């Protein structure tokens, strides 16, 4: 049977493929080009390294020029002061329970500084507290066994002595803390974490700070607060001013972590100048006293009962300086307790409690005359008292 070709041409071919989309082909081409460029960019350093020569070009050193004036001053200060600072290591003698042998156990490290040509070294009391022996290392590497001359736990100051026969290190120059200003530059040299002769810088952040004493002892007053980095091992080292003079002994930090947090404290040099000569001379610090007895708890009760301020004198020692000046203590009569003299201030500085009174007296020396503002039975007067040696 013949095929009608015209009839077949009237219907489309169901298997005919659609014509390619030129837009899709163009997009695929662009995508491939972008991917190739990205790969080339990624491996470009490797390609450059492969084809470039293996020899590295030498770099020229850029001239630095002169150091800044403050840099020169800091460098000069450290170079002059370094030899006056020492590294202290302590050890404790321990007896073995079974063998009864005695051996030395390392205890801690700290810093100190040369006080005079006689070989006296000043440091913190807590650096050598509980130690059986101490070794002092000089900046030139020499080591010496140190002997304890004296200590004042109330001021956290101790004096050691070493026997340097030749090439004695220079004593650190001494300044004053009476005219310090907040904002002054300060420099701390010490051995933080055993890193010997480390220099840190900062400023005086505040003055006349107080810290509680060890084991409930009297507070340490008139401390210098600084933001110079002070860490464990800096204790006992010098705090210097921009002239390289001693203005304090680095003694404590305030830090939750135990490391420097920008709040450090130093015992002022004026306190050091008052305490150290006594330690060298007598081995202990003798506090100046009035010759009276006071008690903080009883004083607070009396102040609450009378609604007053100051420090009540509980008892006057017969023959004491206070007795000669006419001060009187509390009397117990059949009618009750009769308050005696109440000290309002010392040399014009208020004494709000017993601790403040003792701090005011501690600023002076035995033999100094202080002016007390006292009140008894509602009448005020001023009394001059020559300070005597305390107990």
Label the predicted regions.
Residues 2-14:
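N-terminal intrinsically disordered, acidic low-complexity segments at the extreme N-terminus
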Residues 10-12, 20-33, 37-309, 317-318, ...:
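Serine-dependent protease modules
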Residues 121-122, 324-355:
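Conserved PDZ fold ligand-binding element
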Residues 143, 380-382:
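A structural signal for beta-strand boundary/capping segments at domain termini and interdomain linkers
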Residues 367-369:
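Extracellular Ig-like/FN3 beta-sandwich strand-entry sites
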């Amino acid at each position: 049977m013949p095929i009608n070709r015209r009839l077949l041409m009237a219907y489309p071919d169901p298997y005919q493929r659609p014509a390619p989309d030129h837009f899709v082909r163009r997009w695929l081409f662009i995508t491939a080009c972008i991917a190739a460029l990205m790969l080339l960019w990624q491996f470009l350093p490797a390609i450059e390294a492969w084809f470039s020569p293996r020899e590295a070009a030498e770099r020229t050193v850029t001239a630095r020029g002169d150091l800044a004036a403050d840099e020169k001053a800091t460098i000069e200060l450290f170079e002059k002061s370094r030899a006056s600072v020492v590294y202290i290591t302590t050890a404790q003698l321990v007896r073995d329970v079974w063998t009864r042998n005695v051996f030395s156990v390392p205890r801690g490290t700290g810093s100190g500084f040369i006080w005079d040509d006689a070989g006296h070294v000043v440091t913190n009391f807590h650096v050598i507290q509980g130690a059986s022996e101490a070794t002092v290392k000089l900046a030139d590497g020499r080591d010496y066994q140190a002997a304890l001359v004296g200590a004042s736990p109330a001021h956290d100051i101790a004096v050691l002595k070493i026997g340097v026969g030749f090439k004695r290190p220079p004593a650190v120059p001494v300044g004053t803390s009476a005219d310090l200003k907040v904002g002054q530059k300060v420099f701390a040299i010490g051995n933080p974490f055993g890193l010997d002769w480390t220099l840190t810088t900062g400023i005086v952040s505040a003055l006349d700070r107080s810290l509680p004493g060890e084991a409930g002892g009297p507070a340490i007053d008139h401390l210098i607060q600084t933001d110079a980095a002070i860490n464990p091992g800096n204790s006992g080292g010098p705090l210097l001013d921009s002239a390289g003079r001693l203005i304090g002994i680095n003694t404590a930090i305030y830090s939750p972590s135990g490391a420097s947090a920008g709040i450090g404290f130093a015992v002022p040099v004026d306190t050091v100048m008052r305490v150290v000569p006594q330690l060298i001379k007598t081995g202990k610090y003798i506090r100046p006293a009035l010759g009276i007895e006071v008690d903080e708890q009883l004083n607070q009760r009396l102040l609450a009962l009378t609604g007053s301020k100051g420090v009540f004198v509980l008892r006057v020692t017969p023959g004491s300086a206070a007795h000669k000046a006419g001060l009187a203590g509390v009397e117990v009569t059949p009618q009750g307790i009769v308050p005696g003299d109440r000290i309002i201030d010392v040399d014009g500085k208020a004494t709000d409690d017993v601790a403040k009174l003792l701090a005011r007296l501690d600023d002076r020396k035995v033999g100094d005359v202080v002016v007390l503002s006292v009140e008894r039975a509602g009448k005020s007067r001023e009394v001059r008292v020559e300070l005597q040696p305390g107990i």
